[in-house]
């Protein structure tokens, strides 16, 4: 840039040696002669002061070391969109091809051209582009009016993340020329958003908008969304968003909403987006949430909130109460949940226990933490849940005869699906209530008998094995003990509580506990 400065540089985004900043001041800084730019760095550790020099405040920074004064010729104000595309996507012709002469007719006159093939080839390359990635390419503006529409009219997907765009208006100047644009990513641009209304239909074809780390507020989200009538996916990660109002005439077509890492969001704010009619996926990772309630739905009922929500992500939060998952069972359409790295679920040794409890708590769930819930696993989880809280159920007034059930409100609130599980599998038997609870004592040692139905000469053994031991490890132990290859071993078990019923242990990756093996049961080993 030249040393001639004008006031319109204030607020523009710039790059200096790979670091991004915003211009806050342009002018003279005595006693040193010549023009200076005062910039506020995105990385405050890059700066030296707060915008003042020798007692005079030239501009203000959010951080005491966020500012610097820089000569204009050291600053990169960026490039326009079309130039950035050419720099990245147009293949340069060799010098010999550039010198080729060609006769073309313009009007009635023959005109001799040099490099005409090269120009046509470049235009052809640009017009065919449908997906463009210009991340960190110092794009600052749209460029010449109409140039984008003429040069690359077929673009459908654009990544403009981490560039030098300073305003939403500049984004619109680019996107408005791309009539087929469906996906737009402007993350990591410090954008100034409009304070007035935005004309609807500006980005009529847009389906996916990514605004992560742009500093946008919720009110600005709603204003920008007015220009995206067909929007289906909206990403707003890391913006310090506070949901201040309910979207009424906007976001009605959105199917996916990502609000991750917005620590100001709480449970009450989520009610404001709970009526979006088509919202199917909601990502709430790392927002600090610990509870969620649907007060419009009683025990065993479904809420009217989030009517279409199928997939919920609540990773990296503060969920520490099982009641959280009881509430999720009220969501009528929920089929998939991800809840990794929460206080209730982040202990590796309790991972299987937590998974089973969550499955038992949410009846319609099909996928948990991206792992499919097979019918066998659901049955196992629900039976263990029924058994684990059987004594509590009985003490709270539970009875095998439904007419004699007098369950306390406290128990029904803590275990809203328990009655349903009793209807599904039958009330827990007395012998079940006398055994140790499988979910609560996951790593208990089980005393088991080991028999060999096809080897009558083998002596019956008695072994203590941890309930968490996998079938694969049990086979390994028996292989060493019997001198028989692991691949030849077939395991099953029977319980004295159910004589004559033999259950195969067919999945090597599952634990003894998974198959409800208990103290006193008998392992049957065949080869």
UniProtKB/Swiss-Prot annotation:
In-chain residues carrying the UniProt-annotated modification Phosphoserine: 495
Keyword Nucleotidyltransferase part of the UniProt annotation: no
Residue ranges constituting the LRRCT domain according to the UniProt record: 342-384
Cell cycle is among the record's keywords: no
Summary of the function given for this chain in its UniProt record: Tubulin-folding protein; involved in the second step of the tubulin folding pathway and in the regulation of tubulin heterodimer dissociation. Required for correct organization of microtubule cytoskeleton and mitotic splindle, and maintenance of the neuronal microtubule network.
Family statement drawn from the similarity comment of this UniProt entry: Belongs to the TBCE family.
GO biological process: microtubule cytoskeleton organization; mitotic spindle organization; post-chaperonin tubulin folding pathway
Principal location class: cytoplasm
N6-acetyllysine found at: 463
Gene Ontology cellular-component terms listed: cytoplasm; cytoskeleton
Assembly behavior: Supercomplex made of cofactors A to E. Cofactors A and D function by capturing and stabilizing tubulin in a quasi-native conformation. Cofactor E binds to the cofactor D-tubulin complex; interaction with cofactor C then causes the release of tubulin polypeptides that are committed to the native state. Cofactors B and E can form a heterodimer which binds to alpha-tubulin and enhances their ability to dissociate tubulin heterodimers. Interacts with TBCD.
Protein name: Tubulin-specific chaperone E
């Amino acid at each position: 840039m030249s040393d001639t400065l004008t006031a319109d540089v204030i607020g523009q985004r710039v790059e200096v040696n790979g670091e991004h900043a915003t211009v806050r001041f342009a002018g003279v800084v005595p006693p040193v002669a010549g023009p200076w730019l005062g910039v506020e760095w995105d990385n405050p550790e890059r700066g030296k002061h707060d915008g003042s020099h020798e007692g005079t405040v030239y501009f203000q920074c959010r951080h005491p070391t966020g500012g610097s004064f820089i000569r204009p010729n050291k600053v990169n104000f960026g490039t326009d969109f079309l130039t950035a595309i050419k720099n990245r996507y147009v293949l340069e012709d060799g010098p010999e091809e550039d010198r080729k002469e060609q006769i073309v007719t313009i009007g009635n006159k023959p005109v001799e051209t040099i490099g005409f093939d090269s120009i046509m080839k470049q235009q052809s390359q640009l017009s065919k582009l449908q997906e463009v990635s210009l991340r960190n390419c110092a794009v600052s503006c749209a460029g010449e009016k109409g140039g984008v529409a003429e040069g690359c009219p077929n673009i459908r997907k654009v990544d403009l993340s981490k560039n030098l765009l300073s305003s939403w208006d500049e984004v619109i100047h680019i996107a408005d020329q791309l009539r087929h644009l469906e996906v737009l990513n402007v993350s990591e641009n410090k954008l100034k958003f409009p304070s007035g209304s935005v004309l609807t239909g500006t980005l009529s074809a847009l389906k996916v908008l990514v605004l992560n780390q742009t500093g946008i507020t919720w009110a600005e989200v709603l204003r920008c969304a007015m220009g995206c009538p067909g929007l289906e996916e909206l990403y707003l990660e890391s913006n310090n968003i506070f949901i201040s109002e309910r979207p009424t005439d906007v976001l009605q077509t959105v199917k996916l909403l990502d609000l991750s890492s917005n620590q100001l969001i709480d449970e009450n704010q989520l009610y404001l987006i709970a009526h979006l009619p088509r919202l199917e996926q909601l990502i709430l990772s790392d927002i600090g949430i610990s509870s969620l309630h649907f007060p419009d739905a009683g025990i065993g009922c479904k809420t009217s909130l989030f009517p279409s929500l199928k997939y919920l992500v609540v990773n990296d939060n503060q969920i520490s109460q099982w009641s959280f998952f009881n509430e999720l069972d009220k969501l009528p359409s929920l089929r998939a949940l991800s809840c990794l790295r929460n206080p209730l679920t982040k202990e590796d040794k309790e991972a299987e226990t937590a998974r089973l409890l969550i499955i038992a708590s949410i009846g319609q769930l099909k996928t948990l933490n991206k792992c499919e819930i097979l019918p066998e696993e659901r049955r196992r989880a629900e039976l263990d849940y029924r058994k684990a809280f059987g004594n509590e159920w009985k003490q709270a007034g539970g009875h095998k005869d439904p007419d004699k059930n007098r369950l306390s409100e406290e128990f029904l609130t803590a275990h809203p699906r328990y009655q349903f599980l009793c209807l599904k599998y039958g009330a827990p038997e007395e012998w079940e209530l006398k055994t140790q609870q499988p979910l609560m004592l996951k790593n208990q040692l089980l005393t088991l008998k080991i028999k060999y139905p096809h080897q009558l000469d083998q002596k019956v053994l008695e072994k203590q094995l941890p309930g968490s031991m996998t079938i694969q490890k049990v086979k390994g132990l028996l292989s060493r003990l019997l001198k028989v290859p692991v691949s030849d071993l077939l395991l099953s078990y029977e319980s004295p509580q159910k004589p004559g019923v033999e259950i195969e242990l067919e999945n090597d990756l599952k634990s003894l506990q998974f198959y409800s093996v208990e103290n006193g049961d008998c392992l049957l080993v065949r080869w």
